[in-house]
């Protein structure tokens, strides 16, 4: 990215088909594999900047993310190069969602950043650093009527839409010289 090496891992983890409990081991395995990939990158370069992202089909609080990846809720919890920050965990705690199922919202779509992308202080922007994250849920992406009012506007019954998940994003910023 602008000459700066940033490692990006893109995920789409196994669905919850068959039930959350029955399918959870598959996502837990995906979380462990994700952690293994990140650790391999860090072993080669302890200063590696890593972004792992995608539709995890699990929330930030699930075992696959908390234990499998080892994601941290707060930036202040990042102590070593292998630590990874998940800004979407706090958003979930605050009641935000990227998808809805049976009128219950959750955030399965997440972007996490390694310690090397989190600024150590407010002056640490000589290279790309994480600034903020969000859920892109503009009005044109939201179902306006019917049973799924308020849900992401998806293609269904011949009505064009976008997706059953709202997109997520992060800002990486760098000092301009």
Regions found by a protein language model. Give the residues of each.
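Second-shell loop/turn segments in exported
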Residues: 17-27, 52-53, 97-99, 156-157
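His/acidic metal-ligating clusters that form di-metal
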Residues: 30-53
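Beta-strand-turn-beta hairpins that frame and shape the catalytic cleft
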Residues: 1-17, 174-177
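Alpha-helical membrane segments in multi-pass integral membrane proteins
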Residues: 5-7, 27-30
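Metal-dependent phosphoester-hydrolase catalytic domains
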Residues: 42-48, 58-177
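Active-site metal-binding loops of divalent metal-dependent hydrolases
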Residues: 13, 55-56
């Amino acid at each position: 990215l602008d000459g700066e090496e940033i490692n990006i891992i893109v995920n789409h983890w196994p669905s919850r088909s068959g039930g959350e409990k029955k399918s959870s081991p598959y996502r837990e395995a995906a979380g462990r594999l994700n952690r293994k990939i990140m650790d391999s990158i860090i072993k080669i370069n302890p200063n590696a900047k890593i972004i792992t992202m995608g539709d995890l089909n699990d929330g930030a609080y699930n075992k696959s993310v908390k234990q499998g990846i080892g994601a941290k809720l707060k930036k202040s919890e990042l102590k070593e190069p292998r630590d990874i920050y998940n800004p979407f965990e706090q958003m979930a705690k605050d009641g935000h969602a990227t998808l809805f199922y049976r009128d219950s919202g959750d955030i399965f779509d997440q972007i996490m950043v390694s310690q090397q992308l989190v600024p150590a202080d407010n002056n640490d922007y000589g290279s790309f650093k994480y600034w903020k994250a969000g859920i892109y849920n503009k009005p044109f992406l939201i179902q306006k009527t019917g049973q799924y009012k308020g849900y992401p506007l998806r293609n269904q019954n011949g009505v064009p839409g976008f997706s059953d998940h709202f997109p997520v994003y992060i800002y990486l910023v760098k000092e301009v010289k």
